[in-house]
């Protein structure tokens, strides 16, 4: 079977289940299976092996149940870098990239030592380290599997000597002085979680979404602990 035929089969299968991005998803999944870029996939026509056809159909089946593409291919782009993700890490959002530029602008001529609370995949922390070559950071998360994923990304981006990842509550690192704290904490109101799209509420880690009854549980806990936070830079 040719690549174009397989893309059409995958797209039609997803379309019947009302997956809006059916064509794009089919292309992304096949390019992942064939270990090629989507661009190269679309400009060439090749025969697909039986083994890869089986693998492709298996991944399409996962998408039929609304599993996010990022978890299916274990990859999500953030700030032009591909980050490893699975069900233990919140999928990086494009809008989160908006955090990076102001930090880069404020600290580009300084040596920055910062803390990332709820480091997840490491996309925020590692993007800061990538943009600010004189920076160092500590990332904390309470989930061992999440920290494991972050370590995969840390090694891939070759910034191991400037980063430390710890599996512990953030309060336990407040004995250090940081120039900056960054965090993308859970902020969804508990009663609203069931209203989220299926790909989010069924697959992404609840502890990274659930902000408690008012959506501010972690945020209030953080600000309560900030009494011991010092060494803030003046702007």
Locate each region found by the language model.
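Conserved AdoMet
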Residues: 32-106
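Conserved Class I SAM-dependent methyltransferase catalytic core
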Residues: 213-235
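Helix-to-beta-strand junctions that scaffold the AdoMet/dcAdoMet cofactor pocket
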Residues: 159, 204, 230-232
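Class I S-adenosylmethionine-dependent transferase superfamily signal
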Residues: 103, 128, 200, 222-226
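Mobile active-site "lid"/loop adjacent to the S-adenosyl-L-methionine
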Residues: 187-218
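Conserved SAM/SAH cofactor-binding pocket of Class I
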Residues: 95-195
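A short N-terminal interaction module
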Residues: 1-56
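Conserved hydrophobic residues forming the short capping helix/wall of the S-adenosyl-L-methionine
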Residues: 14, 154, 226
């Amino acid at each position: 079977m040719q690549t174009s035929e397989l893309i059409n089969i995958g797209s039609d299968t997803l379309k019947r289940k009302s997956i809006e991005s059916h064509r794009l998803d089919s292309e992304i999944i096949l390019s992942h299976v064939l270990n090629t870029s989507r661009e190269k996939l679309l400009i060439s026509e090749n025969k697909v092996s039986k083994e890869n056809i089986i693998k492709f159909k298996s991944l399409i089946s996962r998408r039929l149940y609304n599993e996010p593409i990022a978890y299916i291919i274990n990859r999500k782009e953030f700030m032009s870098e591909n980050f490893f993700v699975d069900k233990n890490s919140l999928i990086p959002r494009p809008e989160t990239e908006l955090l990076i530029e102001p930090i880069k602008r404020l600290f580009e001529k300084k040596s920055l030592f910062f803390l990332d609370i709820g480091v997840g995949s490491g996309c925020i922390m590692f993007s800061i380290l990538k943009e600010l070559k004189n920076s160092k950071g500590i990332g904390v998360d309470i989930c061992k599997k999440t920290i494991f994923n972050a370590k995969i990304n840390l090694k891939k981006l070759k910034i191991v000597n400037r980063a430390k990842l710890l599996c512990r509550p953030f309060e336990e690192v407040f004995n250090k002085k940081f120039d900056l704290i960054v965090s993308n904490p859970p902020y969804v109101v508990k009663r609203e979680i069931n209203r989220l799209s299926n790909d989010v509420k069924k697959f992404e880690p609840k502890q990274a979404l659930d902000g408690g009854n008012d959506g501010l549980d972690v945020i209030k806990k953080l600000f309560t602990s900030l009494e011991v936070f010092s060494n803030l830079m003046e702007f």
